């Protein structure tokens, strides 16, 4: 038959099985495609491995170390976000070593976080939710100062409060790899590291399009919309009267938006 008349190429069942891996995660058998990570396998099975620097569609950097898990036969913990799931692998996500590692990581991050603002009963964001989940003391030794400063002081739409930034770099990677704008970057190193907006701190000069991608991916709310967040923190933001599906007018892609309508 001519090439355009041929049907789809059928794969032998053995070829399909070779492209799959069967792993055991917390006692549950999971079949995953070759090349997928432990995190992919776990999420596909509904098993929650905590993450902070990892985010869907972003390049994996594995720098927060919150997703480390125990793998049978390995002497050290492995990052679930960056470790390929191989056939026969046995993974424990909440082993004593993994949990203690998460508590240690969260404690270190709390050293540069305003712990007195964390609610006693629940977290306001992803990071605080993990602090509660692993029952980490909400205290600071005071050895390191809080990060300070609004990186967008003249921005009428977005506030970037460094005091709650944990340097996960989600915002930097989202701006660079999803929006392909590259407005944000990490400046300096060590305890002096911070996220900056362009060379002079002016988002307009840096080419910001105010798409809101950095707001969406931030796990602590360090980057947030000005008006809604102020009301949310004050407890005065009412539930939306309705939600309207619309289309973003910025470019020709036609991304759909869900707009929350408050007070008419």
Language model features: what each stretch is:
Residues 11-35, 227-230:
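Generic start-of-chain signal for non-secretory N-termini
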Residues 25-28, 72-73, 262:
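Short strand-turn-strand beta-turns centered on an Asx-Gly dipeptide
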Residues 30-87, 101:
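N-terminal cofactor/phosphate-binding cores enriched in small/glycine residues
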Residues 65, 74-210, 215-216, 220-247, ...:
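Fe-S ferredoxin-like electron-transfer domains
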Residues 69, 257-261:
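Short beta-strand elements
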Residues 245-255:
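Conserved catalytic-core segments of large NTP-driven translation/proteostasis enzymes
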């Amino acid at each position: 038959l001519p090439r355009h008349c041929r049907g789809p190429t059928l794969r032998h069942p053995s070829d399909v099985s070779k492209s799959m891996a069967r792993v055991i995660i917390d006692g549950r058998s999971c079949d995953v495609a070759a090349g997928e990570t432990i995190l992919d396998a776990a999420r596909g099975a509904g098993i929650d491995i905590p993450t902070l620097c990892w985010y869907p569609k972003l390049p994996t950097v594995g720098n927060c170390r919150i997703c480390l898990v125990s793998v049978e036969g390995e002497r050290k913990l492995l990052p679930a976000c960056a470790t390929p799931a191989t056939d026969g692998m046995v993974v424990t996500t909440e082993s004593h070593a993994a949990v203690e590692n998460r508590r240690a990581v969260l404690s270190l991050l709390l050293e540069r976080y305003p712990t007195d603002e964390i609610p006693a009963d629940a977290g306001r964001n992803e990071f605080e939710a993990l602090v509660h989940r692993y029952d980490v003391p909400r205290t600071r030794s005071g050895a390191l100062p809080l990060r300070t400063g609004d990186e967008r002081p003249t921005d009428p739409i977005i506030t970037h409060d460094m005091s709650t930034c944990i340097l996960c770099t989600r915002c930097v990677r989202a701006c660079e790899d999803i929006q392909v704008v590259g407005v944000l970057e990490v400046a300096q190193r060590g305890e002096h590291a911070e996220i900056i907006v362009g060379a002079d701190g002016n988002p307009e000069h840096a080419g910001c399009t105010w798409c809101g991608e950095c707001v969406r991916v931030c796990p602590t709310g360090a980057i947030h919309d000005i008006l809604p967040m102020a009301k949310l923190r004050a407890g005065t933001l009412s539930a939306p009267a309705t939600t309207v599906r619309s289309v973003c007018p910025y470019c020709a892609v036609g991304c759909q938006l869900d707009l929350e309508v408050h007070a008419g």
